[in-house]
Amino acid sequence: MRLPVLAAAVFGLALIASPIAAKKKEALVPPPAPIDMTIDLDPSHDPENVLVLDLSNGGRVDIRLKPQWAPAHVERIKMLAGQGFYNGVIFHRVIEGFMAQTGDPTGTGQSGSPLPDLKAEFNAAPHVRGTVSMARTNDVDSANSQFFIMFYPRFALDNKYTNFGRVISGMDTVDAIVRGEPPQNPTKVVQASLASANKPRPVLAAAPAALTAPSIDELNASKSN
């Protein structure tokens, strides 16, 4: 299995996919067929196709999955989310003004799930802000479990990466994901689930109390005692 990592060159930003060069050259892919670009913004509609990400920054992200665009990729994401595969996985590659990538349980960007890689399902949906798309290697048929969320449009990715959904709520939470490759203190997916499962937000551990030095008055009081 080739290990997906996002990294191909887009306006000076690397956006290919794996330090190991793919042996197979990119196959010629036919132009995508016309598709319905409608995005239902109500997460209560068709909750079986709404992915919910609860992040360690305390926010929640709702993603409208589009099986009409990429049926096999949507099914893979739903299966892995249902198995708890993404729980605890970090955003290991987060580039300001570009995208946030996750989906590798090793946190290195060089791994994925034990499942077989997927055949590309490139489509006409544009890579706009909030787009959720699959990471892959130079081999077009190497997407597995890693995906990325766009901070800003990058139309150079259209028809080169499988676009399978769009953020419909919580883009401010996405914007708050810690930057870095990898970040020093990465944001995690605490819980990934489908809206149909109606899972409550996980309770996050409280941050440790900050240490403070004693005040002058406290020092003087201790001396007088």
Task: Tell me the role of every PLM-derived stretch.
Residues R2-A7, I16-N225:
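Cyclophilin-like peptidyl-prolyl cis-trans isomerases
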Residues V10-F11:
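Metal-dependent nucleotide-binding catalytic modules
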